[in-house]
Amino acid sequence: MLRTVLLSKIHRATVTGACLEYMGSISLDAQLLAAAHILAFEQVHVVNLNNGARLITYAIEATAGSGAVVLNGAAARLAAPGDRVIVLAYGQGTTEELENHQPRVVHVDTGNRIVACV
C-alpha cells in the first residue's frame, strides 16, 4: 500500500503578485524551488493563511533571487499581494520506504528570502 506524505513545504511565503490572465500555476523563485526540492511543473497545494483558501496547482520557475510568489490564472482570485501562503508538495511511498522520511521545510522572511531549511 502506498501512503501519501508531505515531502516539503515553503512556510509563510508572501504573495508578490496575482496574474489572472496567465494560463495557470504558481510562479516561485527558483531558489525557493531548489531549497524545497520542488520540481518545475510538480503538483503543489497552496494554503492562504489570510483567507483560508486552499488550492492545487503546479509550480513554475521564476527568476532566482526575485522573491517571486505569484498566483496565476484562476488561482489569482484566491490570493492578493501581501497574503501569506504555505506551499506544500506531497509524494507517495510504501511504509518501509517512508520509515525514516522527514519533510523538508523552507522558512522565509517577508521578502521570501530563505532564513532556514529544516
From Swiss-Prot:
Keyword Cytoplasm in the entry? The reply is yes
This protein's record includes keyword Coiled coil: no
SUPFAM superfamilies, per the entry: ADC-like (SSF50692)
Mod. after translation: Is synthesized initially as an inactive proenzyme, which is activated by self-cleavage at a specific serine bond to produce a beta-subunit with a hydroxyl group at its C-terminus and an alpha-subunit with a pyruvoyl group at its N-terminus.
* UniProt remark on cofactor binding: Binds 1 pyruvoyl group covalently per subunit.
Catalysed reactions listed for this entry: L-aspartate + H(+) = beta-alanine + CO2
Pfam families in UniProt: Asp_decarbox
Q: Where in the cell is it found?
A: Cytoplasm
Tell me one GO biological process term: pantothenate biosynthetic process
| Molecular functions per Gene Ontology | aspartate 1-decarboxylase activity
Domain of life where this protein originates: Bacteria
- Where, by residue number, does substrate bind? T57, G73, A74, A75
- The active site lies at S25 (schiff-base intermediate with substrate), Y58 (proton donor)
The cofactor required is: pyruvate
Please state the pathway this protein functions in, per its UniProt record: Cofactor biosynthesis; (R)-pantothenate biosynthesis; beta-alanine from L-aspartate: step 1/1
> Which CDD domains does the UniProt record give?
Asp_decarbox
Give the EC number.
4.1.1.11
* Chief location bin: cytoplasm
* Role description: Catalyzes the pyruvoyl-dependent decarboxylation of aspartate to produce beta-alanine.
Task: Give the protein family.
Answer: Belongs to the PanD family.
**Assembly notes:** Heterooctamer of four alpha and four beta subunits.
Question: Which NCBIfam families does the UniProt record give?
Answer: panD
Q: What is this protein called?
A: Aspartate 1-decarboxylase 1
Taxonomic path: Bacteria, Bacillati, Cyanobacteriota, Cyanophyceae, Gloeobacterales
